[in-house]
């Protein structure tokens, strides 16, 4: 199998397929057919994967870290640790040390920091907190704790989807949470469904309805009243972008 095909398979549907592709790529690395950048002492221990919101599976995230010359890499998904074991195994296969953890959003309304913008740019009295360096023996225990958070967020997500559909109803646009949004996530495998999944599903529907380019820009800036910068308009005017749906989301 060609190297590029193996890289694509790092985002395959099943964990077994993804790790199998990593093993095949490691063989190319060992033979010198794939040149690995020298490690320069940099690390990224806050990497999101498809178990929250990302275009990269845990295995693909590790691959990208190796090919970026990182010395270590860590998985941090919102409200989820079920991608951690795959991430650890991919690190062993591809030869890079890994760390694991998770990120949660916390409410500070009843504290002296109420009303302040802490580290959440979109909301006051709210802060993101990360748990780094989770012991490998505690993954199941952490997941049991995070299940409650995922269940609460699912209720919130459904309400957000309902409200968004109310806004979009005059334009004959509607999303079904279970049919259109959840399948974009790894919820079936213990991943989280985030607000970005909702917006990504909407981006797909907008592209289907208006296409890529001027008509979509006009709808966003006209009927929806979204102020678009010149840079954003330029990005959305490029129908050939490989990440067009992400540009719409953002």
Features from the language model and the residues they span:
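Domain-core and long-helix interface of multi-subunit machines
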Residues: 3-56, 68, 148-250
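A metal-dependent hydrolase metal-coordination microenvironment
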Residues: 37-189, 193
């Amino acid at each position: 199998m060609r190297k590029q095909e193996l890289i694509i398979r790092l985002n395959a549907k099943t964990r077994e397929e993804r790790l199998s592709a990593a093993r095949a790529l490691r063989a190319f690395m060992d033979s010198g057919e794939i040149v690995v950048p020298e490690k320069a002492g940099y690390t990224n221990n806050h990497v999101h994967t498809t178990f929250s919101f990302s275009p990269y599976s845990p295995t693909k995230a590790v691959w990208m870290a190796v090919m970026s010359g990182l010395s270590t890499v860590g998985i941090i998904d919102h409200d989820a640790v079920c991608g951690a074991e795959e991430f650890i195994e991919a690190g062993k296969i591809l030869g890079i040390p890994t760390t694991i953890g998770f990120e949660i959003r916390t409410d500070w309304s009843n504290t002296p920091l109420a009303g302040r913008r802490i580290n959440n740019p979109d909301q006051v009295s709210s802060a993101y907190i990360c748990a780094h360096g989770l012991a490998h023996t505690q993954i199941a225990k952490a997941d049991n704790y995070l299940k409650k958070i995922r269940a609460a967020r699912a209720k919130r997500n459904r309400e957000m989807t309902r409200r968004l559909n109310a806004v979009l109803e005059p334009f004959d646009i509607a999303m079904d949470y279970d049919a259109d949004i959840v399948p974009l996530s790894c919820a079936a495998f213990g991943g989280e469904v985030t607000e970005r999944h909702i917006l990504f599903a909407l981006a797909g529907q907008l592209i289907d309805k208006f296409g890529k380019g001027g008509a979509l820009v006009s709808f966003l800036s006209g009927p929806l009243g979204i102020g678009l910068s010149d840079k954003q308009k330029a990005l959305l005017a490029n129908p050939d972008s490989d990440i067009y749906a992400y540009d719409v989301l953002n």
